[in-house]
């Protein structure tokens, strides 16, 4: 059963008529059957923070607190961590991948990212959030690695697809908000 999102619904209603498709997508994208409500909300919140859209992030955080009760703290913490880590990782790994030089490939990144191995929710949930952010950044290497990790953890391709759909719609909604 999808989570109620009254704060997001109120914000969604402020999108202009020119973005009716985005308004409708924002109303439906969190209701898929391939992700649990906590996963869908976590991906959406991570995406909102990743694209630095404070109104969306605030609405999603409010709805996450209301919908998940005790589980909200972990989901919110992981969404914040995933957005922050992916903001760093997508720049670094996209740089290495785009250059394609062995001299860079062999170097240690020397960037801390231990939270990825010790999420507050689950490895699978954190990877879903990370995949959404990787797609937003267009980091091919990151997308491939997070999708492979998710499949290894037992997630379906449909779940991966839904996570990226959520991130895409959040990104589009951010464009229409002041």
List where the protein language model places each region.
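Preference for long, well-ordered alpha-helical segments
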Residues: 128-178
């Amino acid at each position: 059963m999808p989570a109620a999102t009254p704060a997001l619904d109120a914000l969604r209603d402020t999108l202009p008529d020119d973005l009716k498709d985005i308004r409708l997508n924002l109303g439906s994208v969190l209701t898929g059957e391939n992700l649990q409500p906590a996963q869908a909300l976590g991906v959406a919140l991570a995406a909102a923070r990743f694209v630095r859209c404070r109104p969306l992030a605030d609405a999603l955080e409010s709805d996450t607190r209301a919908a998940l009760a005790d589980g909200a703290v972990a989901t919110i913490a992981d969404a914040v961590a995933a957005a922050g880590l992916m903001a760093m990782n997508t720049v670094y790994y996209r740089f290495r991948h785009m250059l394609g030089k062995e001299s860079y490939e062999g170097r240690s990144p020397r960037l801390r990212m231990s939270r990825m191995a010790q999420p507050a929710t689950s490895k699978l949930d954190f990877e879903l959030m990370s995949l959404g952010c990787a797609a937003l950044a267009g980091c091919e290497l990151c997308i491939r690695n997070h999708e492979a990790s998710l499949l290894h953890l037992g997630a379906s391709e449909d779940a991966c697809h839904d996570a990226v759909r959520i991130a895409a719609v959040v990104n589009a909604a951010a464009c229409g908000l002041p």
